[in-house]
A protein has these predicted regions:
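Two-component/phosphorelay signaling modules centered on CheY-like receiver
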Residues: 28-47, 114
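Conserved phosphotransfer cores of two-component systems
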Residues: 60-62, 85-92, 114
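Active-site residues of response regulator receiver
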Residues: 70
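Receiver (REC) domain active-site loop signature in two-component systems and cognate sites
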Residues: 73
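Alpha4 helix (beta4-alpha4-beta5 surface) of REC/receiver domains from two-component response regulators
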Residues: 80, 101-120, 131
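Hydrophobic/aromatic residues positioned on beta-strands within the core alpha/beta folds
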Residues: 97-99
Length: 143
């Protein structure tokens, strides 16, 4: 076996259904952890962004399958960026993640009504993230 090969990965990669993912967070360390986790699940990180405005521009440029985005960021927050991305149809799904979303006065139900494909609280559950990605990889349609 090649010593440079990766460990066994979750099922989505094994069946060749790879999602193209844009990761957005204002904290570089969080962007890296989220991106590494998604790559471990067998999906492709097509880019990253540090805030909502950059996320909107990167989604337009990259056309990812999924945007995994923090909510509380300087400038344009994740909910506003999600709305812009979904209205422009530059990504199929947006998964919002946050540990501080309550301080913005937005509820989980509101996020889902506004079009979020999912919401995860930080620190996120890796198993739950893998499950969402696997489900979305099996369903390439727009939600």
């Amino acid at each position: 076996m090649n010593s440079g090969s990766k460990e066994q990965q979750p099922d989505a990669a094994a069946v060749g259904k790879k999602l193209r993912v844009l990761v957005v967070d204002d904290e570089p360390a969080v962007r890296e952890v989220v991106a590494d986790t998604i790559q471990f699940a067998g999906h492709e990180i097509v880019g990253t962004a540090k805030d909502g405005a950059e996320a909107v521009a990167r989604a337009e440029e990259l056309r990812p399958d999924v945007v995994v985005m923090d909510i509380k960021m300087p400038g344009m927050n994740g909910v506003d960026a999600m709305t812009a991305i979904l209205n422009a149809k530059t990504a199929k799904r947006v998964l919002l993640i946050s540990g501080e979303y309550r301080s913005l006065g937005v509820t989980r139900d509101e996020m889902m009504r506004q079009g979020a494909a999912g919401f995860m609280e930080k620190p996120f559950n890796v198993t739950e993230l893998f499950g969402l990605l696997e489900r979305w990889a099996g369903d390439r349609s727009v939600h």
